[in-house]
Amino acid sequence: MTHQGIGCLVKWLYLVLIVHTLLCIGQLECRQQHHNRNNNNNNRRADSSSSEEGHGNTSDGLDNFADQDASFVGHGHQPRRGQRKKQQGGGGGGSGGGGGNGGGGGSRHNRNEESGISLWINEQQLKMLTALYFPQGYSERLYAIHNSRVTNDLRDTTLYNFLVIPSEVNYVNFTWKSGRRKYFYDFDRLQTMDESILKAPTLSIRKSGRIPQEQKNFSIFLPCTGNSSGTASFNVGLKIQTRHNKPLSGTPIRLNFKKECAHRGVYDIDASNPTSLTTLQECSLKCGKNGYCNEHHICKCNVGYTGQYCETAFCFPQCLNGGNCTAPSVCTCPEGYQGTQCEGGICKDKCLNGGKCIQKDKCQCSKGYYGLRCEYSKCVIPCKNEGRCIGNNLCRCPNGLRGDHCEIGRKQRSICKCRNGTCVSHKHCKCHPGFYGRHCNGRKRRHVHRNDDSKF
């Protein structure tokens, strides 16, 4: 064999050796991957079994997940791979609720908590009820149910003894929402404890029905008889059930309140009894012009006044910014403020670009503007075609226009044809007083009251 033939043979042997080595390395990698896969499966089984044990201790937050896995765990079967993945997400959420390590289920439980059923007294109503006890009113919510849990806020005996609904207030506003689940209500008790002073409470809604999912208001009206003066207690009972007729835990709710009523009649004075006359005269002097003295020698205040001797005027809404209530619903504002509630300031120079005067010579600017008078825009390049600056170089464009500065497109022509009004949107009219209709072309008739004496 020649030297050239030997060289070719050596090259072929070298190539065969390289191929064989690569095949061996590939087999080793396959075995290692198979070994790792087995270890992962074992770990996954262990995790799924532990998540099943942890899942057994959870309650309503993971009801759907428990129903799906009960048939597998209860019969001793190992969950399938797809269900093991479900357990790792859902079961981990259960443990996450306790230790903060889990994922999906725990966050779902939190979302359910945030969207649970709630019932509370309207903040504006609570300000009015507590205005006599707190100078600025009590502005926090007072819950009867908060996130599906019945609270004791409205059932507190201290509140019952402390809070008396004044004679000027004839209703109590409540706000409620059911959230994601369906709940049904039934007012099974609307009762007065003294029918001579207060009639039975009535509702602005049906006595029973479904609680709205979104936030809604309803009122409980408190009609005084008008025949007697005094303070009467009344009770409100409320049952709440799920769509499966299961009562909400903590219900029925029993709420007790007190309502003051004032008789507006005139009492007779026994002139034959000098002592009685003197006492009544003294009582009348104390009550002043804002009230009158009843047969029990107690001042009963006219509408809009309160206090032991009817010396305090009652303003609702409250006077703001340090204003004083000097007469029923009349606020005397301090220097620099104006408005029925002293809610607005007095600015020597007008606030520009939609700004609002909130204090003496101080403007509250709209979005996208700043300065003492809101005269400066945050848009370096002004918005065109009646666009409005709402942020740093950010314009809000009218319909039909677009672009960074509302420079692209054509403004839509308004189809609003108001004859006796002004356009408030693309196709809606706001009619002047005395007119109505889509285009404000209808005139309201004026009712003229004729005096019968004019015949003669």
Curated annotation (Swiss-Prot):
> Which residue intervals are annotated with compositional bias (Gly residues) in the record?
88-107
> Could you tell me in which tissues this protein is expressed?
At the blastoderm stage, it is ubiquitously expressed. As embryogenesis continues, it is expressed in the epidermis and central nervous system, this expression being segmentally modulated. Also highly expressed at the foregut and hindgut throughout embryogenesis. In third instar wing imaginal disks, it is highly expressed in the most anterior and posterior parts of the disk and weakly expressed at the antero/posterior (A/P) compartment border. In the leg disks and the antenna part of the eye-antennal imaginal disk it is also weakly expressed at the A/P compartment border.
> What residue stretches are annotated with the WIF domain?
119-261
GO BP terms: namely: positive regulation of smoothened signaling pathway; protein localization to extracellular region; protein stabilization; synaptic target recognition
Q: Which Pfam families match?
A: hEGF, WIF
Q: Which residues form the EGF-like domain?
A: 279-311, 315-342, 343-375, 376-407, 412-441
From start to end residue, where is composition biased (Basic and acidic residues)?
44-55
The UniProt keyword set, sorted, is: Developmental protein, Disulfide bond, EGF-like domain, Extracellular matrix, Glycoprotein, Repeat, Secreted, Signal
Name where it mostly resides: secreted
Chain positions carrying an annotated carbohydrate? N57, N173, N217, N227, N324, N420
Q: Compositional bias (Basic residues) at which positions?
A: 77-87
Tell me what the record says results from C374S. In shf2; induces defects in the hh pathway
Q: Per the record, which residues fall in region Disordered?
A: 34-112
> Which terms in the GO cellular component ontology are assigned?
cell surface; extracellular matrix; extracellular region
The disulfide bonds in this chain are C224-C261, C283-C293, C287-C299, C301-C310, C315-C325, C319-C331, C333-C342, C347-C357, C351-C363, C365-C374, C379-C389, C383-C395, C397-C406, C416-C423, C418-C429, C431-C440
Where in or outside the cell?
A: Secreted, Extracellular space, Extracellular matrix
Entry's transmembrane regions: none
User: What are the recorded GO MF terms, alphabetically?
Assistant: signaling receptor binding
Q: Where is the signal peptide?
A: 1-30
Annotated function? Required for normal accumulation and movement of lipid-modified hedgehog (hh) morphogen. May act by stabilizing the interaction between heparan sulfate proteoglycans (HSPGs) and hh, HSPGs being required for diffusion of hh morphogen. Not involved in wingless (wg) morphogen movement, suggesting that it may provide HSPG specificity for Hh.
Which additional comment does the entry carry? In contrast to human WIF1 protein, it does not inhibit wg signaling. When transfected into Drosophila, human WIF1 protein inhibits wg function, indicating a different role for shf and WIF-1.
PANTHER family found in the cross-reference section: EGF-LIKE-DOMAIN, MULTIPLE 7, 8, WNT INHIBITORY FACTOR 1
Cite the record's note on assembly: Interacts with hh.
Q: What is this protein called?
A: Protein shifted
Q: Which organism is it from?
A: Drosophila melanogaster
Q: State the encoding gene.
A: shf
